[in-house]
């Protein structure tokens, strides 16, 4: 099958566009809410604090109870998870 140069260029551009939608935006790159101008970075927790990490669960819900020391409350799941940072916060 013989494609013209223009068809090849269009096909390459479409592939780059399709791959760009999946690869181009990483989870930590979106930092500002376009509608409200809120800095979303301050609302996000690092991806390394995943509940899939062994031992990350602190063992309690945090909807009405404060999390234990070195744990944080996940805002959507309402569960306490262990801090995974190497440096402690003040």
From Swiss-Prot:
GO molecular function: ion channel regulator activity; toxin activity
Origin: domain of life: Eukaryota
Record's subcellular location: Secreted
Signal sequence residues: 1-20
Chain residues in the propeptide: 21-60
Described function: Probable neurotoxin that inhibits ion channels.
Domain notes per entry: The cysteine framework is IX (C-C-C-C-C-C).
Family, as annotated: Belongs to the conotoxin P superfamily.
Designated name of the protein: Conotoxin Rg9.1
Species the sequence originates in: Conus regius
